[in-house]
Design a protein with these regions (language model features):
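C-terminal structural segments of small proteins and small subunits
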Residues: 67-93
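Alpha-helical scaffold segments that form or flank carboxylate-/histidine-based iron centers
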Residues: 31-39, 68-75
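Short amphipathic alpha-helices within nucleic acid-binding modules
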Residues: 39-45
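N-terminal first-folded block
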Residues: 1-36
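Short Gly/Ser/Thr- and Asp/Glu-enriched loop/turn motifs at secondary-structure junctions
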Residues: 26, 63-67
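Solvent-exposed alpha-helix faces
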Residues: 46-47, 89
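Short arginine-rich
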Residues: 21-24, 49-59
Length: 93
């Protein structure tokens, strides 16, 4: 499978079985992270930003006080690709 190829439903289901806390929604994968405070949430966001820059692939990030929601998809390809799974593994690694 080429990096830009959209994942098939069974590939997404298999990946979700190995990605704790992630859910599929509207052609993307989403996870909510909770932290003790805003500072902890922002430290996490900065770490995600570093990983995303290194990968050249960036999630949507929403911060609400101590809660961070990440949404990962490959907009250019119109859905989920291996790049998304790879980024999630780096974030959760």
């Amino acid at each position: 499978m080429a990096r830009g190829d959209l994942l098939r439903d069974e590939e997404i289901a298999a990946a979700l079985g190995r990605l704790a806390g992630w859910q599929q929604t509207n052609g993307a994968l989403r996870r909510i992270y909770e932290f003790a405070d805003f500072r902890g949430a922002m430290k996490f966001v900065h770490r995600v930003a570093d990983l995303a820059d290194a990968a050249g692939h960036h999630p949507r990030i929403e911060v609400k006080l101590h809660r961070v929601t990440l949404t990962v998809t490959t907009d250019a390809d119109g859905g989920l690709t291996q790049r998304d799974i790879d980024l999630i593994r780096r974030i959760d690694g």
